[in-house]
């Protein structure tokens, strides 16, 4: 899939604005600029120019496009997404403002808050084919999981990051990091992403690599590399 793209979906809003958007259909856009239109609970978003993100509909559309495997990490401009998205309480009763959730939590309510975050869990919106995820709260919307990927309980995948598949992930894949096929991350291992301390270097791991348990890297790896445990 390539730009320009039109996304169709359902929006959840409150009196302060948009809380969440679930895009379920994509087609070619005929418009000449980025825009969105909301009619009731339906939303249509036009992504024509891949510019820094300026609104919530565009942010959610780009996150969906990556998790649907239409674009790989770093293929879309995700600049400014943190300034656009708001912190939301992701709960068993749907998304809500943290201040609203606070009023409902009294120790006896049935409200369960899964996270307070700008990004919801990916599987609330998208279930990619041929993957396993042991703890779905540890994969953010905007993660790219290729076929044959397994994310174990201690594995984590940030938005705009992911795996080509097949891969076994027991460590952390930070924003901007991409792991190529047949490479594995051991338990507790870390990859330094583009959100780490002002780091601008895009990190990738080549094919048939092993990042040992509790190891960490801040540089890219080529094919057939092994980083011993604890390094």
Where are these regions (language model features)?
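A structural motif detector for beta-strand N-caps
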Residues: 131, 137-139, 143-145, 149-151, ...
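Terminal amphipathic alpha-helical/low-complexity segments used for targeting or macromolecular assembly
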Residues: 1-127
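Core catalytic loop region at the nicotinamide-binding pocket of NAD(P)H-dependent oxidoreductases
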Residues: 199
């Amino acid at each position: 899939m390539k730009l320009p793209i039109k996304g169709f979906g359902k929006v959840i809003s409150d009196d302060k604005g948009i809380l969440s958007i679930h895009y379920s259909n994509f087609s070619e856009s005929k418009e000449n600029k980025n825009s969105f239109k909301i009619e009731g609970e339906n939303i249509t978003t036009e992504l024509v120019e891949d510019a820094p993100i300026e609104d919530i509909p565009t942010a959610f559309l780009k996150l969906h496009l990556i998790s649907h495997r239409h674009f790989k990490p770093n293929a879309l401009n995700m600049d400014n997404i943190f300034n656009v998205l708001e912190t939301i309480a992701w709960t068993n009763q749907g998304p809500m403002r943290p201040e609203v959730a606070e009023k409902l939590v009294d120790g006896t309510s049935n409200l369960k808050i899964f996270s307070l975050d700008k990004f919801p869990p990916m599987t609330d919106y998208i279930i990619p084919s041929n993957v396993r995820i042991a703890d779905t709260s540890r994969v953010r919307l905007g993660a790219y999981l290729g076929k044959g990927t397994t994310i174990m309980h201690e594995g984590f995948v940030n938005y705009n990051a992911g795996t080509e598949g097949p891969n076994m992930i027991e460590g952390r894949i930070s924003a901007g990091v991409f792991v190529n096929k047949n490479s594995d991350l051991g338990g507790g291992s870390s990859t330094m992403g583009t959100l780490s301390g002002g780091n601008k270097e895009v990190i990738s791991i080549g094919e048939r690599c092993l990042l040992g348990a509790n190891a960490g890297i801040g540089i890219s790896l080529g094919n057939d590399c092994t980083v011993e445990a604890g390094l």
